[in-house]
Amino acid sequence: MAYSYTEKKRIRKNFGKLPQVMDAPYLLSIQVDSYRTFLQDGKSPKNREDIGLQAAFRSVFPIESYSGNAALEFVEYSLGKPEFDVRECILRGSTYAAPMRVKIRLIIKDRETKSIKDVREQEVYMGEIPLMTENGTFVINGTERVIVSQLHRSPGVFFDHDKGKTHSSGKVLYSARIIPYRGSWLDFEFDAKDLVYVRIDRRRKLLATVVLRALGYNNEQILNLFYEKVPVYLDMGSYQIDLVPERLRGEMAQFDITDNEGKVIVEQGKRINARHVRQMEAAGLTKLSVPDEYLYERITAEDITLRDGEVIAANTLLSHEVMVKLAEGGVKQFNILFTNDIDRGSFVADTLRADLTRDREEALVEIYKVMRPGEPPTKEAAENLFNNLFFSSERYDLSPVGRMKFNRRLGRPYEVGTDQKSREVEGILSHEDIIDVLRTLVEIRNGKGEVDDIDHLGNRRVRSVGEMTENQFRVGLVRVERAVKERLSQAETDNLSPQDLINAKPVAAAIKEFFGSSQLSQFMDQNNPLSEITHKRRVSALGPGGLTRERAGFEVRDVHQTHYGRVCPIETPEGPNIGLINSLSVYAKANDFGFLETPYRKVVDGRVTDDVEYLSAIEEVGTVIAQADSAVDKDGNLTEEFVSVRHQGEFVRMPPEKVTHMDVSAQQVVSVAASLIPFLEHDDANRALMGSNMQRQAVPTLRADKPLVGTGMEANVARDSGVCVIANRGGVIEYVDASRIVIRVNEDEMVAGEAGVDIYNLIKYTRSNQNTCINQNVIVNLGDKVARGDILADGPSTDMGELALGQNMRVAFMTWNGYNYEDSILLSERVLQEDRLTSIHIQELSCVARDTKLGAEEITADIPNVGEAALSKLDESGIVYIGAEVTAGDILVGKVTPKGETQLTPEEKLLRAIFGEKAADVKDSSLRVPSGTKGTVIDVQVFTRDGLEKDDRALAIEKAQLDSYRKDLKEEYKIFEEAARERVIRLLKGQESNGGGSTKRGDKLSEDLLSGLELVDLLEIQPADEAIAERLTQIQVFLKEKSAEIDEKFAEKKRKLATGDELTTGVLKVVKVYLAVKRRIQPGDKMAGRHGNKGVVSNILPVEDMPHDANGVPVDIVLNPLGVPSRMNVGQILETHLGMAAKGLGDKIEKMLKEQRTVLELREFLDKIYNKVGGEQEDLDSLTDEEILALAGNLRAGVPLATPVFDGAEESQIKDLLELADISRTGQTVLFDGRTGEQFDRPVTVGYMYMLKLNHLVDDKMHARSTGSYSLVTQQPLGGKAQFGGQRFGEMEVWALEAYGAAYTLQEMLTVKSDDVEGRTRIYKNIVDGNHYMDPGMPESFNVLTKEIRSLGINIELKNGD
């Protein structure tokens, strides 16, 4: 196998036994693909499919005027270039978006002839569309945001029942619901009396037959649609019916049934069974004589006209009187409906009988009354309303997904229509659709068919970014359409153009609202690369059109069998959102309809193939799926007699020939975060959930450290998260420094006529959304060869292209003087000294100068009543220097605000007018460092309103940026020149000259001659070979173009910097100061492992006091052994043992290197590690001796191991590895107390565990207050750190003081420390004077209470006891 640049340097030993059939897919594809499909930006307008933006325009246009004389048609849209790039947008606080222009055609027709009179085409600006960055995020108002995908109920038809909860009798009531993509919902439901009702949009219910009548059906037709008929013959005073024996099965015989000879087949009172049916068929019975009583309560199927003209209506219940009328009326034959009590209920007929509407008009009026209560119905209004509800493509759309689900559920064939027309027809309901739904509902009530499971993933679909943006865009366009329709009638008379007609504001507003404030547009979680990826792969059931936390029951939140391989059963938040917010599984993807699919290998006749097929939950029904670890021989045949499989949502065992599919990978079930937990299979599910959630909260440490025990997914996550710099093309590293990498591209990957140079600029010390530090570090060296896709620089929390969220710590499971009580963690001071768990946090502090009523605020160093010392860190403009170390209370930006004018005497006014003295009427409103913060200023940005003069600092910053940019461009051009020179020398070497430059005609061009010349001279040489001359010309042209392009880039940058910034109204200047704060680990910080084993640091001990082993090696962390058994997360113990083996092997390699062993010995030892302990085999022979030495050097800190989820290392393998590292197979070590040197009673489990520092730091939570702000009404201190509030001394705390009898303490708590306004002012004054006397007064809350009682109309007064 070929190793990549980083893999060669550090191979991770993999314990996986199962073959890799397919690699994990690109993890952000659900976001990136969805938005790319929505925009279709790369496609030419003619080739755009009818989806996304194109579909939104097509569905609203053409817009016709009310008269039909003018229309607007959509031609095409185009997206421009965004004004600023992503980094500039983040800096400026603007949105990364592209301007959209739409070509619109205005057609004006002649009023009389309707022929086209005039056509005008024009491009119209339609606002800006936010663009997605390459990592699947959006920059909105300068912050990175993610649009979370939504899991909602798929459009279509669903059949359900109430589980007997609605009616007191416990009777199960069935219902059907047609859910469109947009439009009104249509529900059919049974009530306790077995009548069928209909609801439109969940309003008051109507009898279902009202809708059927409104569709234009009469009684007979309705009965015909739902029932079969049974002919009844009247012959010689007795009745006969046509006999279909099968229909009688299950009924009670109400009379003896005899054959033609009179032999009794079924006696009266017996139940007719299958044997009786067969006997009747054998006897050839076709008619059956029935007594009159048998026909009572039966229902007539159609209108029956008697001899005297009287009509017995269809749907009449037969009774003795009716039968007599029929006999007297000379009716020889009539039809009744075939109904029974077993599987042919007379529900629709009963409903029809209860329905009071007589014809279509009355039915329409009934529906109108329900939909528009209180409005007087007219025939036209009722007709229009009903048609618009379900039969108008403007108001109702089932969508292709809905139609597919609808037809599938009703057992019809389904092909998706491609053209606009067929889509519209399929999008609305037909009469047959409504009747089929009602028919299916009745059949389910009759006991045929099943109700649907609404939590099945075949009935829930994913709406991703693209689709949601499209819907929002359509909403905006529909608003535009209304406005345009009004004005189209004037288009002809006023000679308007499309630009005059269309106002794009509603579209821009709809898009802005969606990206800025939708529930699903979220502030990106940017703690570390994993949290970014997880956020983008999140699937939420909440949001517009989804569920709400309060209404969501237990079933929706629960794990469903269809989640397997689609949605992770582990990763979901704890708390009120549990089960409503999920994470996609590693291999899952959404198909074109939005249903989640997961890949399986096909199995044919018991043989597993390498064909991979993606199945959605709908297609999975009926398949038989084997586990990924089923035993297979070398030809791929399943070897077990009975294979463990999943079938119809159950785990069963089946013979191999019945198996249809097999899992692709053991990790298929879980999400990305869960797949990073080694030995997940040994952890309790609740702890695994905490583990996967806490990995997302890990703060990037100063020096990332790869996990010794990983799962093999680390590299995928680091690469796909986009925090690393990845080579676009292969080549050689030409130049490298801390902020730039330059690659000379390989010849075969170059495009004709380019210099073949790729330049990568790195991100240095920028702030993330969570205030952590984003920084990229180079991992390549000058002259290294890299291939496309290799990692060039690590980002935050990545180490050599692998995700590295924490640090490998030497842990011991033992108690230590109560310092690990209740999951507390005891740390060694060594961790602090080595800065293992130190993180950098960057805070952004802003100072805004506004235009106030009294005059403009000013940013200046001239601040009243502030000493020199306080201004020492500010420059002349009043802004802090970069590099200044500041502490709480220091001034960062000096700012003065005009004070209210005081009454001045005429003399003062005169002096003011003459000398312009203004110092007295401004107050200091500078930006200061908040309490509890200290750090270093690493950057300052100044934004000035357009049209205002920039101050010195702003100009200096601008100049520095321009200089740096010019330097970049110069270097870029220099690199291009160098590359071009080398290519020219390569081309000319060995050629013959035709003169030109310093050469003569016929000169042989040697390398020595050429290398002494400058590029300008080289390009003047004219070679004899014309092809080479042509290529030299190409290079010359290319260099000219590059030079012009670079000049243009510089001019553009200069223009951008020179123009003022768009600031919100009333803001003149904004100064942003970035503070870097270094946070070491300290008691009170929260730490965790990857198995849900979290704890708070309780103490940091000197190294010499920590327990140590016989060699004197101290442990880093002491954990409580009692945290393991009850929590059942044994994975952490296995990780500890395996980590110990990994470190032991590293130590052995280091020893070999120190002893300068031969490369051959190193190879042998590495071969033992990688290829003799089981797991995946590594091809070490493909590495050169230098590469082996480099590999060994990188393994000294420990050999990284991968134990994939559900396919990890076995106990025996861990023991073998421990043995190979010369460590006891038990994994336990004798430890000694560092303080006394005494041995502990028994051996202790010691090993290496990967520990994370979580973003719950004590520095952010620690808070103290003496005085501060008070609440307006109660005059009590505010609460919370953000408000600089106090600690609430509540009811129970008061009880405690009462119980102790601490009267004076209690008094000061309830008065001067809380809401006794005068008392607290007095005591403050007293304390300042050094007099600690307290004089409590009346608490303000007493006054509030008296006022409240008065507001109830009870007069209450306080009488002082004077």
Curated annotation (Swiss-Prot):
EC numbers: 2.7.7.6
Quaternary organization: The RNAP catalytic core consists of 2 alpha, 1 beta, 1 beta' and 1 omega subunit. When a sigma factor is associated with the core the holoenzyme is formed, which can initiate transcription.
A GO cellular component annotation in the UniProt record: DNA-directed RNA polymerase complex
Keyword Isomerase found: no
Lineage, top ranks: Bacteria, Pseudomonadati, Pseudomonadota, Gammaproteobacteria, Moraxellales
Catalysis: reaction(s): RNA(n) + a ribonucleoside 5'-triphosphate = RNA(n+1) + diphosphate
InterPro entries: DNA-dir_RNA_pol_bsu_ext_1_sf, DNA-dir_RNA_pol_bsu_external_1, DNA-dir_RNA_pol_su2, DNA-dir_RNAP_su2_dom, DNA-dir_RNAP_su2_hyb_sf, RNA_pol_bsu_bac, RNA_pol_bsu_CS, RNA_pol_bsu_protrusion
Coiled coil: none
Pfam family of the protein (one): RNA_pol_Rpb2_45
A biological process from GO: DNA-templated transcription
Domain of life, source organism: Bacteria
Function comment: DNA-dependent RNA polymerase catalyzes the transcription of DNA into RNA using the four ribonucleoside triphosphates as substrates.
ATP-binding is among the record's keywords: no
Protein keywords: DNA-directed RNA polymerase, Nucleotidyltransferase, Transcription, Transferase
Protein name: DNA-directed RNA polymerase subunit beta
Similarity comment: Belongs to the RNA polymerase beta chain family.
Catalytic EC class: transferase
A single MF term (Gene Ontology): DNA-directed RNA polymerase activity
